[in-house]
Amino acid sequence: MLPLALEQVSFAVNGKIIIDRVSMEITEGLRTIILGPNGAGKSVLMRLCHGLLDPTSGSIAWRGISNGRSRQAMVFQRPVMLRRSALANVAYGLELAGHSRLESALRARDVIEAVGLAAVMDRPARVLSGGEQQRLALARAWALGPEVLFLDEPTANLDPGAARDVETLIGQIRAGGTKIVMTTHNLGQARRLGDEILFLSQGRLVERAPVDRFFAKPASAEAEAFIRGELPWN
């Protein structure tokens, strides 16, 4: 279903421009990190790519097709947990995707074990820790076998140990052949998990570069200031 092509994509709310004429192509292979200060438009851009939002102008197409959502998934910073067990949370998504109840239960159990949640799979999902809930959300998405997985700040609210577990799991998913596209504020995490950086500032795609080059020699004043930890200007 890749590449995903955005052509002059803009998104506005009540006249306020959130995404400003972004053109880019997301291809197979590389781990793509979307980086930028608060309010840069990272999460909105992810939702546009995923299909949760429609652009105000411009076009978004998967391999030339305007609707390619069937082979991709998204995990949010604060995932919604259904009022059922951890295992049933995963199985339910599989049933909605058209799998039989038996097939869904077996696949859900395999994935729950793979993400290290076997010991809590019968507990209500809503009583799990934040780190466990994030791994469960990743398990729900992974179980569907997506070609592309969008991750919106997946460790933003987690302690260091839980964040490490989630990073390890992201590596597992990527090793299985899934394309990772992820937002983060964490520069160290971007270095660890990314191959390329898409840097946003005030809704514009300011820079795109390999991770090492981006951090060693940013091509824009905005990116250089962001790396130094300076507050963005208006």
Predicted regions and their residues:
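A short, surface-exposed alpha-helical micro-motif characterized by mixed small hydrophobic
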Residues: 190-192
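Helix N-cap at the start of a conserved alpha-helix in ABC-type nucleotide-binding domains
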Residues: 160-162
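H-loop/switch region of ABC-family ATPase nucleotide-binding domains
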Residues: 184-185
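Catalytic Walker B motif of ABC-type/P-loop ATPase nucleotide-binding domains
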Residues: 149-152
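Conserved ABC ATPase signature
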Residues: 124-128, 132
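Helix-to-loop junction immediately C-terminal to a conserved catalytic motif
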Residues: 50
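Conserved ABC ATPase "signature" region
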Residues: 102-120
